[in-house]
Amino acid sequence: MDYPQQHIKPYNEDGKKTEQVERMFDNIAHAYDKLNHTLSLGIDRSWRRKAIAWLRPFRPQHIMDVATGTGDFAILACRELNPDELIGTDISEGMMNVGREKVKKEGLSDKISFAREDCTSLSFADNRFDAITVAFGIRNFEDLDKGLSEMCRVLKPGGHLVILELTTPDRFPMKQLFAIYSKVVIPLLGKLLSKDNSAYHYLPDTIKVFPQGEVMKGVISKTGFGEVHFRRLTFGICTLYTATK
């Protein structure tokens, strides 16, 4: 199926969205962590903890963190869940290089590894992982259905999927406040801290049109997952989706 965010590209150039997303994240990798925590006022850490708390009872030993970026979620998941193996995948080597340094400093290089992967064409075998996580990256998929289908393919039967994604609040006054914040504050801070003006216009543009709530639940369900649920966090600014294969 065709989704609006798939046509939004960071630099509005001809060519594949994936290539532009890769270039964008390579460009902002040096400032990404600072921006992420600043723009969310640090609340993103609590969102990650809620996602990991949902996984904890299942004790997954082999985890893939898709769109791992600089490895924030991977590091926290490794510390909290203590899996045998955690592979962070991303298309941006710039982001993963930052992640590799962080993992080394944390002393987790024996548990966490990184691999350059296109989420719509994963190189892993079927039924490979106990759990798959995606934190704030699924909006960037060039083909949402294909990406979800690939994650379902490499997840073991009975395995679990956890997605965190930024969403638009649907109630007054947060809806109006978030609209102003995303239209004015996010692009301004993004330009000041990352020096990439396009990246932080792209972010609110994709949040606005990305499937959310019941619609996203349906998208996940049709790609092979069951027991799909969602929970809105912090007045709907973020949504946690969970599913089982």
Curated annotation (Swiss-Prot):
CDD domains under this entry?
AdoMet_MTases
Query: What Enzyme Commission number does this protein have?
Result: 2.1.1.163
Official protein name in the record = Demethylmenaquinone methyltransferase
Which residues does the annotation say bind S-adenosyl-L-methionine? 70, 90, 118-119
Q: Which GO terms describe its biological process?
A: menaquinone biosynthetic process; methylation
Establish whether keyword Methyltransferase is in the entry: yes
| UniProt keyword terms in alphabetical order | Menaquinone biosynthesis, Methyltransferase, S-adenosyl-L-methionine, Transferase
Citing just one GO molecular function, the answer is: methyltransferase activity
Task: Tell me any Pfam family this protein matches.
Answer: Ubie_methyltran
Its UniProt pathway annotation is: Quinol/quinone metabolism; menaquinone biosynthesis; menaquinol from 1,4-dihydroxy-2-naphthoate: step 2/2
Q: Which organism is it from?
A: Bacteroides thetaiotaomicron (strain ATCC 29148 / DSM 2079 / JCM 5827 / CCUG 10774 / NCTC 10582 / VPI-5482 / E50)
Catalytic reactions of this protein: a 2-demethylmenaquinol + S-adenosyl-L-methionine = a menaquinol + S-adenosyl-L-homocysteine + H(+)
What does the function comment of this entry state?
Methyltransferase required for the conversion of demethylmenaquinol (DMKH2) to menaquinol (MKH2).
Q: Which SUPFAM superfamilies match?
A: S-adenosyl-L-methionine-dependent methyltransferases
Q: Which family does it belong to?
A: Belongs to the class I-like SAM-binding methyltransferase superfamily. MenG/UbiE family.
